[in-house]
Amino acid sequence: MIRVMENNDLAQCGMIYSKAFPMEHWGIDWTAENATEYLQDLFEQKRFVGYVYEENSEVLGCIFALCKISGSKEEIDIHEMAVLPERQGHGIGKQLLNAVKDYSKEKGLAGIVLYTSEYAPAVKFYEKNGFKLSNGTICMYCE
């Protein structure tokens, strides 16, 4: 079942996040603790929108988004989504995305933005769920 995220969900979300984004795939050493702290920062943002997927009182997936003004339009920016690895491929991610899509439509937002790695399963998943590459946008990084 999808429901609106609550503060007391964050520890479970941090654990899920640390398992869904292992060091060997993403190059970041996420622990349940530092992931929870990171997600808490997102949760506390003024325009935060978040949902969890729950079965039998256990959170199995979560999505963290922020509404933002982009020029003359308002969009929603998905910052993070994570599903327990052993539950991936069972429609949980799709349901979480649909919750954000429904929110966007209800609020009359212009669209939904997200960034992901070129890691093929993620790109294919998002394309399958209606997302497409945005022309002229690249991600740049500096140390």
Task: Enumerate the language-model features and the residues they cover.
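Conserved beta-strand-loop-alpha-helix junction that forms the acyl-donor binding cleft
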Residues: 113-123, 141-143
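Conserved beta-strand in the GNAT
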Residues: 52, 58-67, 77, 82
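A conserved beta-turn-beta hairpin within the catalytic core of GNAT-like acetyltransferases
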Residues: 68-78, 88, 134-135
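A short beta-loop-alpha structural element at the N-terminal edge
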Residues: 1-15
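Conserved acetyl-CoA-binding loop-helix of GNAT-fold acetyltransferases
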Residues: 83, 89-102, 128
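Conserved GNAT-fold acetyl-CoA-binding loop/helix
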Residues: 18-40
